[in-house]
Structure formats: structure tokens, C-alpha cells
Regions:
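Residues that define the transmembrane beta-barrel architecture of outer-membrane proteins
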Residues: 29-31, 59-65, 103-109, 123, ...
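Outer-membrane beta-barrel translocator/channel fold
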Residues: 31, 35-55, 78-81, 102, ...
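Transmembrane beta-strands of outer-membrane beta-barrel proteins
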Residues: 31-35, 86-90, 123-131, 175-177, ...
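Residues on the lipid-exposed face of transmembrane beta-strands in outer-membrane beta-barrel proteins
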Residues: 35, 67-71, 109-115, 129-133, ...
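Transmembrane beta-strands of outer-membrane beta-barrel pores
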Residues: 37-43, 71-73, 92-98, 131-139, ...
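Surface-exposed strand-loop-strand hairpins of Gram-negative outer-membrane beta-barrel proteins
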Residues: 42-64, 101-103, 239-266
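Outer-membrane beta-barrel "beta-signal"
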Residues: 67, 197-216, 381-401
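Repeated loop/turn-to-beta-strand initiation elements of outer-membrane beta-barrel proteins
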Residues: 76-78, 121-125, 171-175, 211-214, ...
Length: 401
């Protein structure tokens, strides 16, 4: 089964006030359940969504109904206090779009994180991150579903970003309203896959199984600041659009030849500027097997993949990087530009200098980390990049949060 986790960084300004519970009787984080409804529309980002489909109608209705199960933190851990007591958990949803004949009836499973921008005694302004998978799509098929260039596989990643306002309306009951941006894509593992994006307001109701009232924390929190050099390696596979998926006689036979391997090596310097974040920059080296490659068919009708010299030559780039730290999790964003690469003729006509990386990593003991990113060129997803690495740290000193 395809395992895709999209990932995505939100950089929000948060102030330095921290919070804790006003009741010593609460000994653990608070379990809660929520029901949530979204109703919105699709962004007209490709021809299929704009109306070039079997119905000759734009896709303009998006409905999602979710059940969420999570924990509201209460400030037992320092990271909970620093982030003003966020909530996290898992969600399940069903999705309905006004073109079921070509899109299907997808459903999704995801993890969520509700970060706090500012908290009052009975309410909070929050940002939301949801990462997971969506299943049961009707995807592109040259014979039965030829117009659907938006979804290339039955399983896709689901990436959702949002902003909301949460309000205590009764004891243990919360009402939340806000808006979401939701993206579905398979990260170029199977093409055509233009992806599809939705914007939708939402409302949700939550029940907490304990008291939720909070008050500011007065305890001062210190943490060691450090500098570090991170070294990581990454890997992904992708499928490129070429004549095969447009030719029914070739697609079924030679589809495996359309899979290309991508390897990355990344090294960067990072400085922890506060307990919640790091910034820095570095060098990215990428080897992309697809560059300049061809699929050739000989006189006997046998196909083979022919790699060019570009497939074995590095793409070297420089980038700026930021990490938002949430306990042992880092939300990563890189923005950079390629400074060296050899081009095939086709690439030179369509070359893209900028690259982006959005993802999440987890820090294990001994400064080892592993994660998954969306690695993009010119804001277009190139691969889902699985990676692991090591952070060499030095010059530690105590700093304010």
C-alpha cells in the first residue's frame, strides 16, 4: 500500500506568555472528541477542475465531515507550556465532491495538531495542521476516466492548514469555527497528477472529559541554546508524464519504466534562536534519474529506459531553512535556488531554478532524526522525500524561551 505523508510548515508569530492549568486535580492531558463539518469550493488550478471533464461543469462544491479524537494538553511538559497548551490527535473524515462519477467518494485518516497563537481564559486563537492519507479516489484512467488529470492514484496524501477560534460555551463543551485550505496529491508517484485544492469554512463541536479552564504560568523556563550542523540523506520515486500515459497500447506494458529514482544529500548549519525554533542555511545536492532520460522502443517492440548523462550529474543548490520545534518534532521549511546543473535540451527550455522543501521530522536519542518532506521545484511537487540524518551540536548556553 502506498504510504504518503504530505507535510507542511506553518510559521506563525507567537508571543512569550505560557500557560498552565488552574486546578491541581487534573493529573493528565484531557481526552476530547469532536465533530466537524466543512463546506467550500475547489480552487480552479487545472483544466479538469475548471470544467474540462465529462460533465463539462466546474468542480465547485466540497463537503467534508470529520470525527476527531484527541488530547488537550494542560502544561505538564515544558513544550506544552511554551506552545500555550496545544491539542493533538487523530481524525477520520468522509469527503463529497460534486463530480462523484469522476472523483469517487473518498475518505481520509489523518493526524492533527492545533497550535495556539493566543489563549484567553475561555477561548483561543489557533492554527491547525492536518497530515494524512485519503483513500478511494476514482483516479485517472485512459479508458474509463480520461479527463481526471487532478488525481493520479486511488490513494493520495492529505494536507490541511487552517486558522480557527475556539470558545468555551458550557462546562466541558467547546465551539470552534474557522477556515481550512486542503490539498490532495500523490507527490508525483503516479501521473498525471495535477492535484486538487479546496478552501472551506468549518464549524466543530467538542466535548472534553475534564475541566478545560486555564490560567497563565508564572514559572520561568530556560533551555540550552546551541548551534548545529545537520547532515541527511533522502530518497523518493516519481513518475514523469511522457507519451506512455497518452497511448493505451503502451501504458499497461511499459508503465514500470516510468518510475524514476531521486536521491538527495543535504547539509546545513542551524542556530537555535529560541526554544521554539531554529534557522539557518546550507547546501542541497540532488541526483534525479529522470533528467534527460528516454523510453525507447526497438524494432522488435521491446521497450527500455535510456538514461542520459544528466541522470548521473548532481544538481547543486543553496537554501535557507527554518524549523518550528514542538517537543521532539520539527516542522521544516527550506527555500533555495539551484546554482549548478547541466541541462538536457528539453530541461533548458523548461528549467526551474527555485526549489522548496516542506516537511516534518522526529528527533530520536543521540541527535538522530528521520522525516518526510514534499520536495518541490518551482512550487510543483517533485517527490515525496523520505530522509534520515544526524545533527552535530556545540556551543550550548542557557537562553530565555
Amino acid at each position: 500500500m502506498m504510504k504518503l505523508f504530505g507535510a507542511l510548515l506553518i510559521l506563525l508569530i507567537v508571543n512569550n506568555n505560557t500557560w498552565a492549568t488552574n486546578s491541581d486535580s487534573i493529573k493528565s492531558n484531557i481526552l476530547f472528541i469532536s465533530v466537524k463539518g466543512n463546506y467550500g469550493t475547489a480552487l480552479k488550478s487545472n483544466d479538469f477542475v475548471r470544467g474540462q471533464n465529462a460533465n463539462n461543469e466546474a468542480i465547485d462544491q466540497f463537503k467534508e465531515f470529520s470525527a476527531l479524537f484527541g488530547l488537550q494538553t494542560i502544561g505538564k511538559e515544558e513544550w506544552e507550556q511554551l506552545h500555550k497548551m496545544p491539542a493533538y490527535g487523530i481524525g477520520l473524515s468522509v469527503i463529497r465532491i460534486n463530480n462523484e462519477a469522476e472523483m469517487g467518494k473518498p475518505f481520509s485518516a489523518y493526524g492533527f495538531y492545533h497550535g495556539v497563537i493566543h489563549r484567553w481564559s475561555k477561548s483561543a486563537l489557533r492554527y491547525d495542521v492536518e497530515l494524512g492519507l485519503a483513500f478511494n479516489w476514482k483516479c485517472f484512467d485512459l479508458q474509463s476516466n480520461p479527463y481526471n488529470i487532478a488525481i493520479g492514484s486511488k490513494i493520495t496524501s492529505r494536507i490541511c492548514l487552517g486558522l480557527d477560534y475556539e470558545l468555551l460555551i458550557a462546562k466541558n463543551c467547546m465551539l470552534t469555527f474557522g477556515g481550512n485550505f486542503t490539498h490532495f496529491s500523490n507527490g508525483a508517484i503516479r501521473k498525471p497528477n495535477k492535484g486538487i485544492n479546496f478552501v472551506s469554512p468549518f464549524i466543530s463541536f467538542s466535548y472534553l472529559f475534564d475541566n478545560h479552564e486555564l490560567k497563565p504560568l508564572v514559572t520561568d523556563i530556560k533551555k540550552e541554546q546551541h548551534h548545529e550542523v545537520q547532515i541527511s540523506v533522502g530518497y523518493g520515486i516519481k513518475q514523469e508524464e511522457n507519451v506512455l500515459w497518452q497511448n493505451p497500447e503502451l501504458t499497461s506494458v511499459y508503465e514500470k519504466l516510468q518510475k524514476y529514482h531521486v536521491f538527495t544529500l543535504k547539509t546545513n548549519y542551524m542556530r537555535q534562536y529560541c526554544q521554539k525554533g531554529k534557522w539557518g542555511g546550507g547546501v542541497n545536492i540532488c541526483f534525479d534519474e529522470w533528467r534527460g532520460s528516454e523510453i525507447r522502443i526497438d524494432a522488435n517492440g521491446k521497450a527500455r529506459k535510456v538514461l542520459s548523462h544528466c541522470s548521473h550529474e548532481p544538481i547543486i543548490g543553496l537554501f535557507l531553512s527554518h524549523e518550528l520545534l514542538i517537543s521532539k518534532v520539527g516542522i521544516v521549511t527550506d527555500l533555495g535556488g539551484n546554482v549548478y546543473m547541466s541541462y538536457s535540451h528539453v530541461e533548458y527550455q523548461n528549467r526551474k531554478i527555485l526549489f522548496e522543501r516542506l516537511g516534518v521530522k522526529y528527533y530520536f536519542p543521540y541527535n538522530i532524526f528521520a522525516g518526510v518532506n514534499v520536495f518541490a521545484n518551482g512550487v510543483k511537487a517533485n517527490i515525496i522525500e523520505w530522509n534520515m540524518g544526524y545533527a552535530l551540536q556545540w556551543h550550548k548556553r542557557s537562553v530565555d524561551r
